[in-house]
């Protein structure tokens, strides 16, 4: 039909109705037909439109002034049924066709349900469409249309038009008491805001009902992953209490398990203990927004078969098919869906009316005739869970007083998972559960099944044992590249996972994994001489046991041992070693210089124990590596270092005068071979030009022409080698026989004062004009000075020197013919004197830091108090006094390498427990270089300094004698520093001695600090508090053995120590005894130089001293007069080697090289094909004879109860406090062998086992034998048909 105007459509409908009245009770027309079904439901059908429309929209709208909301539904078929309409109110019905371009009106009709039922043919009349008067329509009282069952589910949505409230509010008082349980979905998909709309909906549905103990009782359960009773039927007795409880209802959250919730309602809410009344009608209203994650069919069938009216309300994504499966018939009354939570409000009034009509339409006894009452049934007791393994549990219980037909055993993981069940015969009182997951807590329930229903169940929690790990891991065989591992199998394991990884990985080495079916594995491709961590884990499906590990070390390929060197020269060396015990194919020796510029390789037979390396470069360090090569690879490398000697110089030089002015120079060759040329240079002393000649390397003599008979010469010779090396030059002083210039002898140095040295010598024979003295600090850090001494004197004093400093002095005699050789000697100036008599050289640091009576007041953080024993006062250094001086202000000269640090100290209670430097020298950046540390926490003393290589050397003393320093009394401590050791004395008694490396040169610049904390850095760092009475550095390491510690009363000796000076004042004028010797005064200024004294008498000749160092070059003489031209020289020797020539032709190919080492392991191979299908399992045993069958209605009930797979799921045993945890269960395929892991090498490992026989899903075996026929008269249901 076209989408023409509504007036034409109404006219056609009016004409059709007028022509057909009186033919039958049901109004009919060619376009629209209405029929009234039981419970005042209205069924409508219309003619299907031509073309491809999108469906139909049906609108049932109350007439003006009605307070009810309109009803809109959509359908794909030309029929629909509407329920919940008021029989006495008028409605307007419109049917639209939905197309892609909009909607088009097909039919319109106004009706009243009572008029349609009561109108008769003689009172029928028509009225124009839109008149507003109700149209009388005969009632259709027969059965519903047989096509009704196939009608699509429709959705009720509220109209967007505003409604004007009118009429009284609806109230419902059923003729019989009613027990109403609301089952509300509280899953995460609803949300907090929508859950408030759900609570408003519940309040609107409950509001019309009269609530009381003898009227309507309301209970409510909220569910998600588990079900929770919010209140029972008998908990609240008034409507106000119920509505208040709805408002207080809190959102639960979780997953959607509707089947579990229905079983909870059956087992908990619909029980006499919860307020259920046997005479009351029972109604369950389900509100959900999604599809259940578990089975709902069984629990819903049990509820409906027990006479419970189930209404289902779905929102948004609710599964309509599932709602229809849950609800009681008729589905068009009990199933409702809305598209959004906002539309629940429009459905509330309609749902209240439908529930009320259902309660008014029949008593609670209208259910199935055979439906049993929900009475309490006997239950078993004393559930015992025993014989727990990793995959099985044994259950036993005390049977109920009345034996049930069967027991339903239901179990599932307590933290979520799919429940499983098994049925055992009634007489049994125990069973075993198999195929469980290891280390999993299970909730187990046992339900007795009687003819009248399901009794209360037993429940228990049990945790399966872990899968046992492998035991007794054993290394059956270990080779350099393989490990054979075995172990004892573990019960229940189907295969094993073996992991192998290096104990100390190198780079990106990965862990290797392999799965095996037998308790052994062969791991290959390993590296020799490495530790491997191997672990084995038992597996059963996806489960794994605790891993057991073992460490395996592959043996190394034996390397050579005891590497050594001999016959080391400047260009060759011999390396030797101890051979390996196993047969060696070849020994490879490689060497490379430390700079990497020179390398080489040589190979020796397998039985060789030495090899010669060469040619090498002189004065070069080589790294030598020796490796044994075996047929299976190379051993580890033995490494050593060798340094070649310096290129040797010619030796044993001698000069022989020849006739005329020629002289022959002879020498011993520098090396047997390798010398390319000798270069000889001679230079006359004083004035003259140097001459040079070259001699071939195979000669040992040379003639030097043109030497004057009255001139001395310096002759130098050096050797050049073929590898480019050059020896050190060797010099010889040649003096003709006609010239004699002897140097002075017996040169001696003595220290008169800290700033002067006395030099004396024995004059030589001959007329000496004067002596030339040159002196400078031996360290080379100071300036060089010279002085001339008259020839008549043989001694001189060198003034203005640094104290405690070594000086090198050279003296040469000046003759008329020139200068003699210089003789040298080394001497050291004395340290400053600590005593007036100069008997104790050293440095007084108390004076340097102004810790004296007349100067301490100007120092911040320092206080002075008289000594308890008289004599020297005591100075207290408070915390953070920060006493710091520059090195140059404290030590006018460097410290001698051998010295003694002396201090008299007392540690105070406020002295910190951490280490601090009583005295130390630092660099400019305050890095410690030298000092003494006291650690009150460890009760130890540490001395440290830097050696000549700037490395830190330290010695720590912590014996019992050292601990008393920290007990709060004064103690005198000597730290005697020698060249190779340091000794500690406490109260003049030796405590300990420690070896220590030689001290380097003390810093000339930097700082000296007192009490500085060891961790402190920078100029403003913290310092410790302590008392100090003495701090000296004595320029000797033997002073500790001479000191008598007279400052301490316990160490005083009356014979050697003077009496203490009393600090008390005496009234007597009698002078007392002389006081102790006072401290040395400050150095005075230098006096004016005195007049030169007379020469003293010549002393006796001294002992000949050691040969001195090479003298410094003499002063540059004045240019001489130009000489006459010389004679024509002799023909010179052969010149030096020329430049390198061009490269020669390529040589012949070398011999075939040795086989290289094994390459790295290749990449993993591709995954192998699936294994073959395992053998079919053995057939199960023949089933027992079935029991006598029951009547069909009772058998049907048993069948429904047995399918209640979720009876135990709704039990709230320990579930309210336990969050849901999904358990991943692997789907097993029959007899399929698992895929193997990819192999790492082509070599086959230990063969795997055949796959075990698969387990049929749901734990069923082979079908049992057909049960025998029951007794005549009643056909028995077989066991399989009853319980599947």
Curated annotation (Swiss-Prot):
Record gene name: COL20A1
Alphabetical list of InterPro entries matching this protein: Collagen (IPR008160), ConA-like_dom_sf (IPR013320), ECM_Regulatory_Proteins (IPR050991), FN3_dom (IPR003961), FN3_sf (IPR036116), Ig-like_fold (IPR013783), TSPN-like_N (IPR048287), VWF_A (IPR002035)
Function (record text): Probable collagen protein.
Segments of this protein annotated with the region Disordered: 122-171, 1065-1190, 1212-1284
A Pfam family of this chain: fn3
Organism: Homo sapiens
Polar residues composition bias: residue spans: 1271-1284
Positions of the Collagen-like domain: 1071-1127, 1133-1190
Keywords in alphabetical order: Collagen, Glycoprotein, Repeat, Secreted, Signal
Pro residues bias spans: 1071-1082
Intracellular or extracellular location(s): Secreted, Extracellular space
Low complexity bias (residue ranges): 1112-1125, 1166-1181
Fibronectin type-III domain span: 28-119, 379-468, 469-559, 560-647, 649-738, 743-833
Domain Laminin G-like: 842-1037
Protein name in the entry: Collagen alpha-1(XX) chain
Predominant subcellular localization, coarse grouping: secreted
């Amino acid at each position: 039909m076209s989408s023409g105007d509504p007036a034409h459509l109404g006219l056609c409908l009016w004409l059709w109705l007028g022509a057909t009245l009186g033919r039958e009770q049901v109004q009919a027309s060619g376009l629209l037909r209405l029929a009234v079904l039981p419970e005042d439901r209205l069924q409508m059908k219309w003619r299907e439109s031509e073309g491809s429309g999108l469906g139909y929209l049906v609108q049932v709208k109350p007439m003006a002034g009605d307070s009810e909301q309109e009803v809109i539904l959509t359908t794909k078929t030309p029929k629909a049924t509407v329920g919940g309409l008021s029989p006495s109110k008028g409605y307007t019905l419109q049917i639209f066709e939905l197309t892609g371009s909009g909607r088009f009106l097909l039919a319109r009709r106004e009706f009243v349900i009572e008029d349609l039922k009561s109108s008769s043919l003689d009172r029928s009349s028509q009225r124009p469409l839109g008149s507003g008067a109700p149209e009388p329509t005969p009632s259709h009282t027969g059965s519903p249309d047989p096509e009704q069952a196939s009608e699509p589910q429709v959705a009720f949505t509220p109209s967007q038009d505003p409604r004007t409230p009118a009429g009284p509010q609806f109230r419902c008082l059923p003729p019989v008491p009613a027990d109403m349980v609301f089952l509300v979905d509280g899953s995460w998909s609803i949300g907090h805001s929508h859950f408030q709309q759900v609570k408003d909906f519940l309040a609107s549905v409950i509001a019309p009902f009269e609530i009381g103990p003898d009227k309507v009782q309301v209970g409510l359960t909220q569910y998600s992953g588990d079900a929770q009773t919010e209140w029972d039927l008998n908990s609240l007795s008034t409507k106000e209490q119920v509505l208040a409880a709805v408002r207080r209802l809190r959102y639960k959250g979780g997953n959607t398990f509707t089947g579990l919730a229905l079983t909870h309602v059956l087992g908990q809410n619909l029980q006499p203990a919860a307020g259920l009344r046997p005479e009351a009608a029972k109604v369950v209203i389900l509100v959900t927004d999604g599809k259940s994650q578990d089975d709902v069919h069984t629990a819903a069938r049990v509820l409906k078969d027990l006479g419970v009216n189930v209404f289902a309300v779905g929102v948004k994504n609710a599964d309509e098919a599932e709602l229809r499966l849950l609800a009681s018939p008729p589905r068009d009354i009990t199933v409702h869906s809305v598209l959004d939570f906002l539309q629940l409000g429009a459905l509330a009034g309609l749902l209240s009316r439908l529930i009320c009509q259902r309660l008014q339409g029949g008593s609670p006894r209208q259910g199935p005739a055979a439906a049993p009452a929900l009475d309490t049934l006997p239950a078993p007791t004393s559930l015992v869970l025993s014989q727990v393994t990793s995959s099985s549990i044994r259950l036993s219980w005390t049977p109920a007083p009345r034996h049930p037909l069967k027991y339903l055993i239901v179990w599932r993981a307590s933290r979520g998972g799919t429940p499983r069940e098994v049925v055992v015969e009634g007489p049994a009182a125990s069973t075993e559960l198999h195929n469980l997951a290891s280390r999993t807590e299970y909730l187990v329930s046992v339900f007795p099944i009687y003819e009248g229903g399901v009794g209360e169940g037993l429940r228990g929690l049990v945790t399966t044992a872990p899968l046992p790990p492998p035991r007794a891991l054993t290394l059956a065989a270990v080779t350099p590249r393989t490990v054979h591992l075995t172990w004892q199998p573990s019960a229940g394991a189907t295969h094993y996972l073996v992991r192998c990884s290096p104990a100390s990985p190198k780079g990106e080495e990965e862990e290797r994994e392999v799965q095996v079916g037998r308790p052994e594995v062969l791991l290959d491709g390993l590296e020799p001489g490495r530790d491997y961590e191997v672990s084995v884990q038992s597996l059963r499906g996806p489960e794994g046991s605790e891993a057991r590990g073992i460490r395996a070390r592959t043996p190394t390929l034996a390397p050579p041992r005891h590497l050594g060197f001999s016959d080391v020269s400047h260009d060759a060396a011999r390396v030797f070693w101890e051979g390996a015990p196993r047969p060696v194919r070849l020994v490879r020796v490689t060497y490379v210089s430390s700079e990497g510029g020179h390398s080489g390789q040589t190979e020796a037979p397998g039985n060789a124990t030495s090899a010669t390396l060469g040619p090498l470069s002189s004065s070069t360090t080589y790294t030598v590596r020796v490796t044994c090569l075996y047929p299976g690879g190379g051993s580890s490398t033995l490494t050593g270092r060798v340094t070649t000697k310096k290129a040797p110089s010619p030796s044993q030089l001698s000069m022989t005068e020849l006739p005329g002015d020629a002289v022959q120079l002879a020498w011993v060759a520098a090396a047997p071979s390798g010398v390319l040329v000798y270069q000889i240079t001679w230079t006359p002393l004083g004035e003259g030009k140097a001459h040079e000649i070259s001699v071939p390397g195979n000669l040992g003599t040379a003639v030097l022409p043109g030497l004057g008979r009255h001139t001395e010469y310096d002759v130098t010779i050096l050797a050049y080698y073929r590898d480019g090396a050059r020896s050190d030059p060797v010099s010889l002083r040649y003096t003709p026989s006609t010239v004699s210039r002897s140097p002075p002898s017996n040169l001696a140095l003595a220290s008169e004062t800290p700033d002067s040295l006395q030099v004396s010598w024995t004059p030589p024979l001959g007329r000496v004009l004067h002596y030339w003295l040159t002196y400078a600090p031996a360290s080379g850090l100071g300036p060089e000075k010279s002085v001339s001494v008259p020839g008549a004197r043989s001694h001189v004093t060198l003034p203005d020197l640094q104290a405690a400093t070594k000086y090198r002095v050279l003296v040469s005699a000046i003759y008329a013919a020139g200068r003699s050789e210089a003789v040298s000697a080394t001497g050291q100036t004395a340290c400053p004197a600590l005593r007036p008599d100069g008997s104790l050289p050293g440095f007084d640091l108390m004076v340097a830091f102004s810790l004296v009576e007349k100067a301490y007041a100007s120092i911040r953080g320092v206080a002075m108090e008289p000594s308890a024993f008289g004599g020297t006062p005591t100075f207290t250094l408070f915390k953070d006094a920060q006493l710091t001086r520059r090195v140059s202000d404290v030590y006018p000269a460097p410290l001698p390498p051998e010295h003694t640090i002396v201090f008299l100290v007392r540690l105070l209670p406020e002295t910190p427990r951490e280490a601090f430097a009583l005295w130390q020298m630092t660099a400019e950046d305050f890095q410690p270089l030298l000092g003494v540390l006291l650690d009150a926490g460890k009760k130890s003393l540490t001395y440290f300094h830097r050696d000549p290589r700037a490395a830190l050397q330290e010695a720590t003393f912590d014996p019992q004698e050292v601990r008393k320093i920290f007990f709060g009394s004064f103690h005198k401590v000597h730290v005697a520093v020698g060249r190779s050791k340091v000794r500690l004395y406490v109260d003049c008694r030796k405590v300990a001695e420690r070896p220590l490396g030689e001290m380097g040169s003390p810093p000339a610049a930097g700082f000296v600090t007192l009490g500085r904390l060891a961790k402190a850095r920078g100029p403003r760092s913290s310092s410790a508090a302590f008392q100090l009475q003495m701090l000296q550095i004595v320029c000797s390491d033997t002073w500790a053995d001479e000191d008598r510690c007279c400052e301490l009363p316990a160490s005083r000796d009356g014979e050697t120590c003077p009496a203490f000076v009393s600090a008390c004042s005496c009234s007597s004028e009698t002078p007392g005894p002389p006081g102790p010797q006072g401290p040395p005064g400050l150095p005075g200024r230098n006096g004016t130089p005195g007049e030169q004294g007379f020469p003293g008498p010549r002393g006796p000749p001294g002992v000949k001293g050691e040969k001195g160092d090479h003298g410094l070059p003499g002063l540059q003489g004045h240019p001489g007069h130009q000489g006459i031209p010389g004679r024509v020289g002799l023909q010179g020797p052969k010149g030096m080697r020329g430049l390198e020539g061009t490269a020669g032709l390529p040589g012949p190919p070398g011999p075939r090289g040795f086989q290289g080492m094994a390459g790295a392991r290749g990449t993993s191979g591709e995954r192998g094909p699936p294994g073959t299908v395992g053998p079919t399992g053995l057939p199960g045993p023949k089933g027992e004879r079935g029991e006598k069958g029951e009547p069909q209605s009772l058998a049907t009930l048993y069948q429904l109860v047995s399918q209640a797979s979720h009876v135990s799921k709704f039990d709230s045993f320990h579930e309210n406090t336990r969050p849901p945890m999904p358990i991943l269960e692997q789907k097993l395929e029959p007899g399929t062998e698992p895929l193997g892991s990819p192999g790492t090498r082509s070599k086959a490992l230990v063969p795997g086992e055949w796959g075990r026989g698969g387990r049929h899903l749901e734990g069923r075996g082979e079908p049992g034998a057909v049960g025998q026929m029951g007794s005549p008269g009643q056909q028995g249901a077989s066991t399989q048909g009853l319980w599947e």
